[in-house]
């Protein structure tokens, strides 16, 4: 059940969203940028060998760890120079969505669910550095495959995160991988553990690797856990009683 504090924060946040904001347009821009990038990068690949393709799983694992790292140490920490990310995520996203009520009501709530479209541009720009290194020590094909993979993972991230915050449906409940990350992420929205557990938003591999998952099972079990709560650790922190004063949410908003 949604608290009065969460209700107040949601109402206040929604009032601040620009009248002309369009959730579908927001998503369209993200995927237009991402898919256009992948199309361009893919068209630079010619005669890739099997050794070139090995960079795809390597990039996937590196991106999974980066996703975990930036979520834990930037999005949940007030780091100088990145305060905008911290405020948007910890102080806004985690008040709008909690483990008591984690779903969106309309497409205007995409504003608090998706990153701004320019974030993808920044992410692809960051990928140029490792891609350049790959071109030197691997091949030019490997570099372009790396760019394709990082852009694809970003789009994967946005889609999975949306699925975490949609209303309950047979699709999100039964679709493998999506049902896993949905339970994983909703648990992360519990304020008692959000600073310590469940930082992955695609596949909980890094959470398993660095022991920051709320589950006690192997990596395959983590990835295909679904909604199963049988393996949730019993020694997790419990949520402390907090004020339900709506004004408290508005002050922090």
How would you label these PLM feature ranges?
Residues 1-37:
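Cytosolic-side membrane-entry/anchor segment at the start of a transmembrane helix
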Residues 39-54, 132-145:
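Helix-coil boundary and interhelical linker segments in multi-pass alpha-helical membrane proteins
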Residues 24-42, 118-134:
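Hydrophobic core of alpha-helical transmembrane segments in multi-pass integral membrane proteins
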């Amino acid at each position: 059940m949604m608290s009065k504090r969460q209700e107040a924060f949601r109402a206040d946040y929604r009032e601040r969203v620009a009248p002309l904001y369009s959730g579908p347009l927001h998503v369209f821009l993200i995927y237009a940028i991402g898919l256009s990038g992948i199309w361009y990068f893919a068209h630079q690949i010619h005669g890739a060998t099997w050794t070139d393709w090995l960079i795809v799983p390597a990039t996937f694992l590196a991106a999974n760890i980066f996703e975990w790292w930036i979520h834990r140490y930037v999005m949940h920490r007030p780091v100088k120079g990145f305060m905008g990310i911290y405020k948007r995520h910890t102080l806004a996203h985690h008040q709008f969505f909690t483990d008591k009520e984690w779903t969106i009501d309309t497409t205007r709530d995409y504003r608090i669910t998706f990153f701004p479209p320019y974030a993808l541009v920044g992410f692809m720009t960051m990928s140029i550095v490792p891609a350049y290194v790959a071109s030197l020590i691997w091949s030019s094909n490997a570099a372009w495959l790396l760019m394709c993979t990082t852009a694809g993972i970003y789009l994967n991230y946005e889609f999975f995160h949306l699925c975490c915050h949609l209303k309950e449906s047979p699709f999100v409940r039964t679709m493998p991988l999506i049902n896993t990350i949905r339970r994983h992420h909703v648990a992360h929205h519990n304020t008692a553990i959000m600073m310590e557990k469940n930082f992955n938003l695609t596949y909980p591999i890094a959470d398993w690797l660095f022991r920051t998952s709320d589950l006690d099972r192997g990596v395959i079990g983590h990835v295909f856990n679904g909604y199963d709560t049988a393996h949730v650790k019993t020694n997790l922190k419990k949520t402390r009683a907090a004020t339900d004063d709506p004004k408290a949410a508005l002050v922090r908003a």
